[in-house]
Each structure stands twice: as structure tokens, then as C-alpha cells.
């Protein structure tokens, strides 16, 4: 869990608090698993509140990437954009109108009429809204995990001199590892490996799947990184370039020395979610 505040400029984001709490129940009935999530979130909020960190603001939570469908539509000249977005949501999700939740926004691409549509099962959103409410959080935004991670790593890049040119981002998650090559406003997915094939990562790195980059940012839970039988240092050795583990400890809108907080890379998803919250 990450709590951020924003003062003025986009870059002036302050980390008010960070907290981790194990869920403690990975299997079992769905109701029991979500009850465990609610207890863990409430415990994290309680500790942050005891440290005088306000947690009663609006919240953002994530969906797994495979729980959300997205599409880009060119609707230039059409006046029925909301209806067209809903129809697209039904089409790409295959869900009934009363069982989905969707949103759309202007894409900001080359064509002025392009919109981006995101859709997910309504039940998944309702679960998260309920869990957040039990912890006293008003959930107002749902985002995708990989989108949140990419947002966090691109924000971190502004504090690294080696990231002024092309750089890469690696995210280790339960499903495996994802990699992007980033240059300017462009972020291109270049690597997707399943967690069931850990031996494929060293080979992909040696083949320069990330391309020529000045540095690589790494995010993800230490358990997920260890599953690939590697480490941040080993990734740097294979690539022969600087590797930066995500660490937002102490960020106050200004570059600062990395604190080397244990588990720092695991906060990338939470930070990216909170970043969207303060920006919106």
C-alpha cells in the first residue's frame, strides 16, 4: 500500500507512507480469500493511521491484466461516443450489459477521434469496492497492474541520469515477467515470459531482447524475482548496463539517494496506482 500527495507540478509527488501486509490465504473459497484481503488492508491502514498518515482519501486498486480488456477505437466525426464505447465494451468482453463495467477516454494518439476503452466484469470491481470500504477507503479508480507498474517506473526514470535516452523496464509478477523498451513518450512491450519457464529469461537477456539501452529499471516482489533464479545484480551483469531496482522510499518531488529499502521493487504497483490517483 502506498499513500501519496501532490503539491503543484506533476513531478512534485510526496510519499506519505508505505506499508506491506501479507494476505495469509492464497487458496480456498473466494469469499474467504477476499475476507483475508480485507483484513490485511485494514491492518495496513491501521498502522499507517497510527503513524499519522491519512488514509481516508480516495483510493485506487488494480485488476490483473487478464481480468481487463482494452481496445482503441477511431470514432472521428461520431456524436454517439458513449454509446459506441459501450457497444465496444460488450463486444471485446463478451459480457452481458448488466455484468460489465467500462470506461473510456480520449486516447491522445495521432488521430484526434481515437478513444481508449477498458472493460472488466462488474463483480470484480464490486469486490474491490467492498474490500476498500471495509478499510475506510473510498475506491474511485480501477487500473491495470502492468499500466500501474509502467507509470511508476517511468516516473522513477526522471530521477536517473542514465535514463535520459532509451531505457528498459522489467516487471516480475505472479504470471511471469514483462519487459518494455522506453524512449521518450514511447513504451513498447518487448518481452513477455511465463513464470513456468524461468530458464528463458537469461537467454532472452543475452539475445538483447530489450535492445540497446542505457539502464534497466526492475520492479516486482522478491519472491517473483527469485523464481527466475536471478537477482538485480545478475541482470546487470548479463546486460552490461546499469540496473535500478524500484525504490520510492523518501521521495518528496526531488531526486534523492535510494534508501535500499527491503522489498522496495514490490511497491511499484501500489506507487503507480497512487500516482494515477493524485494525478487525476
Where are these regions (language model features)?
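Hydrophobic/aromatic-enriched cytosolic interaction surfaces used to assemble or bind macromolecules
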Residues: 1-280
